[in-house]
Regions:
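...captures the hydrophobic TM-helix bundle architecture rather than a specific catalytic motif
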Residues: 2-187
Length: 187
């Protein structure tokens, strides 16, 4: 999983740190210093990092907090708190996914399509793969919520929730890197 995201970050940084000109322009503008393009490529309108991406960042950070709350509540034997915290975490995961879907809708209709070059390709693949991980994590936490309801988790036996929490925090950290690199620095 980590290496998959490393590949996307690598592609993003390779393309953004040494932007290439389209082949048509390359032949016309080549000189002894070499041709260098701009980043993001001309014609690509990027998202305002303080709009939907920032809201999604806040949502994931809050969900990381509620996930940790759920884990500690189970460890302390506070079942009702764990249920409440897991409901909040799952709800925040669903909110993130819906906002990401809305962002994709906006991107396709107002910003860029997948086929518009390297920036959209890496953007859609990296954020889409992350979004897939959020959906998997939301389902994972939903199963944990069901198991807490059924009293399957105790202070001594809660590995499923602990694994889900580790997974969820991985998803949080990846998003922070995506937010900083793609939305802030990449724009």
């Amino acid at each position: 999983e980590v290496m998959f995201f490393v590949a996307f970050f690598w592609a993003f940084f390779d393309a953004s740190l040494t932007p290439k000109l389209p082949i048509e322009e390359f032949a016309e503008t080549f000189d002894s210093n070499g041709a260098v393009g701009v980043w993001p490529p001309e014609g690509i309108k990027t998202f305002d990092p303080l709009d939907i991406p920032f809201l999604n960042t806040l949502i994931l950070l809050m969900s990381g907090t509620t996930c940790t709350w759920a884990h500690h509540a189970v460890r302390e034997g506070h079942r009702d708190q764990a249920i409440q915290a897991l409901w909040l975490t799952v709800g925040l995961g669903v909110c993130f996914t819906l906002l990401q879907a809305f962002e994709y809708y906006e991107a396709v209709h107002h910003y860029f399509k997948f086929t518009d070059g390297i920036y959209p390709s890496v953007f859609y693949m990296a954020t889409g793969f992350h979004g897939f991980h959020v959906m998997v994590g939301t389902i994972f936490l939903g199963v944990c919520l069901f198991r807490v309801y059924k009293n399957h988790m105790t202070p001594d036996r809660h590995f499923g929730l602990e694994a889900a929490a580790w997974y969820w925090h991985f998803v949080d950290v990846v998003w922070l890197f995506l937010y900083v690199c793609v939305y802030i620095w990449g724009a």
